[in-house]
Curated annotation (Swiss-Prot):
Biological process (GO), any one: photosystem II assembly
Coiled-coil portions: 174-201
InterPro entries: Thf1 (IPR017499)
Superkingdom of origin: Bacteria
Keyword Coiled coil annotated: yes
Disulfide bond found in the keyword field: no
GO cellular component, one term: plasma membrane-derived thylakoid photosystem II
A Pfam family per the record: ThylakoidFormat
Protein name listed in UniProt: Protein Thf1
Gene: thf1
PANTHER family the record matches: PROTEIN THYLAKOID FORMATION 1, CHLOROPLASTIC (PTHR34793:SF1)
Keywords linked to the UniProt accession: Coiled coil
Species in which this protein is naturally found: Prochlorococcus marinus (strain MIT 9312)
Family indicated by similarity: Belongs to the THF1 family.
Function: May be involved in photosynthetic membrane biogenesis.
Lineage: Bacteria, Bacillati, Cyanobacteriota, Cyanophyceae, Synechococcales
Amino acid sequence: MKAKLTVSDSKKLFHEEFPYVIPGLYKRIVDEILVELNLLNHQNEFKQDYLFCIGLTETFKELTKGYKPEKHLDLLFESLCISTNFEAKEIKEISKISQKEFSDKSSKDILKLLKEKSNSKLYPSRILNLGIYILISNSQDFKENNDIEKNKMISDIFEKLSLSRNKAEKDIGIYKSSISKMEQAKELIQEQRIKDKKKTL
């Protein structure tokens, strides 16, 4: 069994594995993921299930969009996993296989499959909640609904899985807000670059 690492240990190991400067826009995101993975690794009841794998790979992918150089992203993900006692390759494989299993399904079919695959009680975490949200948001009927109907659909599914609806709504809200803020920040940076370029002409 691997030794439990402190957050400080994980950060030190991460920087040994990833010896590059992380662009300022992404530093907070990377730090938050590292701390969260470290804390989950200390929870005795936590299990690395397929929902956790989907949540981790897909939120990482979404929140690091536009990261330069792009070729560093695989190493960045691997370094986050290594420094918190997780296996990056295994997580990616489980995520890919599981998402394929849930693709092209209605929200009702997704809920049915979620219940079938959840043999034991799901360990609640932000990453797991986001994994479920990502599966639901990719369902055939989800995109056809308005925001009120979407929120109700999400709440109903979390309740039927015996997970906190309020916690899920909060986690999803923060996640969507983070994506929005990242997009706004990237637009401002791009606008500034254009202005700076015009000044040099």
